[in-house]
Protein backbone atom coordinates (compact mmCIF):
# COMPACT_ATOMS: atom_id res chain seq x y z
CA UNK A 1 0.00 0.00 0.00
CA UNK A 2 2.90 2.32 0.78
CA UNK A 3 4.35 1.64 -2.67
CA UNK A 4 1.07 2.72 -4.29
CA UNK A 5 1.09 5.94 -2.31
CA UNK A 6 4.73 6.59 -3.18
CA UNK A 7 4.12 5.91 -6.89
CA UNK A 8 1.13 8.28 -6.91
CA UNK A 9 3.11 10.94 -5.03
CA UNK A 10 6.06 10.56 -7.40
CA UNK A 11 3.76 10.83 -10.40
CA UNK A 12 2.20 14.01 -8.98
CA UNK A 13 5.61 15.56 -8.26
CA UNK A 14 6.80 14.79 -11.78
CA UNK A 15 3.67 16.35 -13.27
CA UNK A 16 4.16 19.52 -11.22
CA UNK A 17 7.83 19.69 -12.25
CA UNK A 18 6.87 19.13 -15.88
CA UNK A 19 4.30 21.94 -15.72
CA UNK A 20 6.89 24.25 -14.17
CA UNK A 21 9.31 23.32 -16.96
CA UNK A 22 6.62 24.11 -19.54
CA UNK A 23 6.12 27.56 -18.07
CA UNK A 24 9.86 28.33 -18.34
CA UNK A 25 10.61 26.90 -21.84
CA UNK A 26 9.27 29.31 -24.55
CA UNK A 27 9.54 26.98 -27.59
CA UNK A 28 8.26 23.50 -28.32
CA UNK A 29 10.07 20.60 -30.02
CA UNK A 30 9.10 21.77 -33.54
CA UNK A 31 10.10 25.36 -32.80
CA UNK A 32 6.63 26.75 -33.58
CA UNK A 33 5.10 29.51 -31.54
CA UNK A 34 1.41 28.55 -31.44
CA UNK A 35 -1.11 25.87 -32.33
CA UNK A 36 -2.33 22.50 -31.07
CA UNK A 37 0.33 20.57 -29.19
CA UNK A 38 0.44 17.25 -27.40
CA UNK A 39 2.48 17.29 -24.23
CA UNK A 40 4.21 14.23 -22.76
CA UNK A 41 4.52 14.77 -19.04
CA UNK A 42 6.33 11.83 -17.53
CA UNK A 43 7.77 8.40 -18.02
CA UNK A 44 8.75 6.61 -14.81
CA UNK A 45 10.69 3.33 -14.65
CA UNK A 46 10.99 1.69 -11.25
CA UNK A 47 13.63 -1.06 -11.00
CA UNK A 48 14.27 -3.39 -8.06
CA UNK A 49 17.66 -4.90 -7.29
CA UNK A 50 16.28 -8.42 -6.92
CA UNK A 51 15.75 -8.74 -10.64
CA UNK A 52 12.07 -7.85 -10.44
CA UNK A 53 11.25 -4.83 -12.57
CA UNK A 54 8.22 -2.63 -12.02
CA UNK A 55 7.41 0.02 -14.60
CA UNK A 56 4.94 2.82 -14.00
CA UNK A 57 4.36 4.75 -17.21
CA UNK A 58 2.16 7.80 -17.36
CA UNK A 59 1.51 9.34 -20.76
CA UNK A 60 -0.65 12.38 -20.29
CA UNK A 61 -1.52 14.45 -23.32
CA UNK A 62 -3.44 17.67 -23.21
CA UNK A 63 -4.49 20.01 -25.96
CA UNK A 64 -3.41 23.65 -25.77
CA UNK A 65 -4.92 26.37 -27.91
CA UNK A 66 -3.50 29.80 -27.22
CA UNK A 67 -1.72 32.66 -28.86
CA UNK A 68 1.18 32.48 -26.39
CA UNK A 69 4.18 30.32 -27.15
CA UNK A 70 3.39 26.83 -25.78
CA UNK A 71 6.20 24.46 -24.98
CA UNK A 72 6.74 20.73 -24.92
CA UNK A 73 7.50 19.30 -21.54
CA UNK A 74 10.74 17.33 -21.29
CA UNK A 75 10.61 13.56 -21.14
CA UNK A 76 11.71 12.60 -17.65
CA UNK A 77 13.05 9.19 -16.69
CA UNK A 78 13.67 8.37 -13.04
CA UNK A 79 15.07 5.11 -11.63
CA UNK A 80 14.06 4.23 -8.08
CA UNK A 81 14.72 1.05 -6.07
CA UNK A 82 11.55 -0.15 -4.35
CA UNK A 83 10.03 -3.32 -2.94
CA UNK A 84 7.55 -4.99 -5.31
CA UNK A 85 3.82 -4.57 -4.79
CA UNK A 86 0.95 -6.34 -6.45
CA UNK A 87 -1.64 -3.54 -6.63
CA UNK A 88 -1.21 -0.05 -8.07
CA UNK A 89 -4.05 2.46 -7.71
CA UNK A 90 -3.88 5.99 -9.05
CA UNK A 91 -6.84 8.32 -8.78
CA UNK A 92 -7.39 11.71 -10.35
CA UNK A 93 -8.91 14.19 -7.87
CA UNK A 94 -12.24 15.64 -8.89
CA UNK A 95 -12.68 13.30 -11.87
CA UNK A 96 -14.31 9.88 -11.86
CA UNK A 97 -12.46 8.09 -14.64
CA UNK A 98 -13.53 5.00 -16.50
CA UNK A 99 -10.94 2.34 -15.66
CA UNK A 100 -10.03 -0.48 -18.04
CA UNK A 101 -7.61 -2.91 -16.39
CA UNK A 102 -5.77 -5.53 -18.42
CA UNK A 103 -3.28 -8.14 -17.30
CA UNK A 104 -1.07 -10.46 -19.26
CA UNK A 105 1.55 -13.09 -18.53
CA UNK A 106 3.88 -14.03 -21.31
CA UNK A 107 6.31 -16.87 -21.72
CA UNK A 108 10.01 -16.10 -22.03
CA UNK A 109 11.11 -14.33 -25.20
CA UNK A 110 14.04 -15.33 -27.37
CA UNK A 111 15.95 -12.30 -26.10
CA UNK A 112 15.25 -13.09 -22.44
CA UNK A 113 17.05 -15.72 -20.44
CA UNK A 114 15.50 -19.19 -20.72
CA UNK A 115 14.24 -19.26 -17.13
CA UNK A 116 12.88 -15.71 -16.91
CA UNK A 117 9.20 -14.90 -16.68
CA UNK A 118 7.70 -11.54 -17.63
CA UNK A 119 4.37 -10.51 -16.11
CA UNK A 120 2.73 -7.20 -16.85
CA UNK A 121 -0.48 -5.44 -15.93
CA UNK A 122 -1.79 -2.33 -17.62
CA UNK A 123 -4.49 0.11 -16.57
CA UNK A 124 -5.83 2.83 -18.87
CA UNK A 125 -7.83 5.68 -17.40
CA UNK A 126 -9.46 7.98 -19.96
CA UNK A 127 -11.04 10.84 -17.99
CA UNK A 128 -11.51 13.29 -20.87
CA UNK A 129 -10.76 13.09 -24.55
CA UNK A 130 -7.65 15.21 -23.99
CA UNK A 131 -6.38 13.37 -20.89
CA UNK A 132 -5.04 9.82 -20.95
CA UNK A 133 -3.26 8.17 -18.03
CA UNK A 134 -1.70 4.74 -18.46
CA UNK A 135 -0.19 2.80 -15.59
CA UNK A 136 1.80 -0.31 -16.47
CA UNK A 137 3.25 -2.60 -13.83
CA UNK A 138 5.48 -5.41 -15.03
CA UNK A 139 7.62 -7.84 -13.05
CA UNK A 140 10.45 -9.84 -14.58
CA UNK A 141 11.99 -12.66 -12.59
CA UNK A 142 15.45 -13.95 -13.47
CA UNK A 143 16.37 -16.94 -11.29
CA UNK A 144 19.94 -16.89 -10.11
CA UNK A 145 22.01 -19.73 -11.38
CA UNK A 146 24.22 -21.31 -8.71
CA UNK A 147 27.75 -22.39 -9.56
CA UNK A 148 26.94 -25.87 -8.32
CA UNK A 149 29.03 -28.21 -6.24
CA UNK A 150 32.60 -28.46 -7.40
CA UNK A 151 35.26 -30.72 -5.78
CA UNK A 152 38.34 -28.81 -4.75
CA UNK A 153 41.30 -31.18 -4.27
CA UNK A 154 43.46 -28.53 -2.58
CA UNK A 155 40.85 -27.89 0.10
CA UNK A 156 40.38 -31.63 0.62
CA UNK A 157 44.11 -32.28 1.13
CA UNK A 158 44.44 -29.15 3.26
CA UNK A 159 41.61 -30.31 5.52
CA UNK A 160 43.27 -33.70 6.00
CA UNK A 161 46.66 -32.09 6.79
CA UNK A 162 45.04 -29.66 9.24
CA UNK A 163 43.18 -32.47 11.01
CA UNK A 164 46.32 -34.61 11.29
CA UNK A 165 48.28 -31.62 12.60
CA UNK A 166 45.74 -30.89 15.33
CA UNK A 167 45.61 -34.58 16.33
CA UNK A 168 49.42 -34.82 16.47
CA UNK A 169 49.65 -31.70 18.66
CA UNK A 170 47.03 -33.17 21.02
CA UNK A 171 48.89 -36.53 21.14
CA UNK A 172 52.26 -34.89 21.88
CA UNK A 173 50.65 -32.65 24.52
CA UNK A 174 49.07 -35.61 26.29
CA UNK A 175 52.36 -37.55 26.21
CA UNK A 176 54.22 -34.59 27.74
CA UNK A 177 51.57 -34.11 30.41
CA UNK A 178 51.69 -37.73 31.56
CA UNK A 179 55.52 -37.86 31.45
CA UNK A 180 55.91 -34.77 33.65
CA UNK A 181 53.25 -35.85 36.06
CA UNK A 182 55.15 -38.97 36.85
CA UNK A 183 53.93 -42.36 37.97
CA UNK A 184 52.30 -42.44 41.36
CA UNK A 185 52.20 -45.80 42.95
CA UNK A 186 49.94 -46.42 45.84
CA UNK A 187 50.74 -48.82 48.56
CA UNK A 188 48.11 -51.37 49.31
CA UNK A 189 46.85 -51.30 52.83
CA UNK A 190 46.25 -54.58 54.54
CA UNK A 191 42.48 -54.15 54.57
CA UNK A 192 42.54 -53.50 50.75
CA UNK A 193 44.58 -56.58 49.98
CA UNK A 194 42.91 -59.78 49.04
CA UNK A 195 44.41 -62.68 50.80
Curated annotation (Swiss-Prot):
Phosphoserine PTM sites in chain numbering: 187
Chief location: membrane
Topological type in the membrane: Single-pass type I membrane protein
Cellular location(s): Membrane
Ranges facing Extracellular side: 24-152
A Pfam cross-reference name: MGC-24
Keywords on record: Glycoprotein, Membrane, Phosphoprotein, Receptor, Signal, Transmembrane, Transmembrane helix
Glycosylated residue positions: 36, 45, 51, 59, 109, 115
Signal peptide range in chain numbering: 1-23
UniProt xrefs under InterPro entries: CD164_MGC24 (IPR007947)
Protein task: Implicated in oncotic cell death, characterized by cell swelling, organelle swelling, vacuolization and increased membrane permeability.
Family: Belongs to the CD164 family.
Designated name of the protein: Porimin
Natural source organism: Mus musculus
Amino acid sequence: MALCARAALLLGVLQVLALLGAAQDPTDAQGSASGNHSVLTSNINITENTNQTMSVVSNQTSEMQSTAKPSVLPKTTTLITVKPATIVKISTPGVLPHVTPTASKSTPNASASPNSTHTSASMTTPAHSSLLTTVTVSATTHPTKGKGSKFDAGSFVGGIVLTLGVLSILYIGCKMYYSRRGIRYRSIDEHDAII
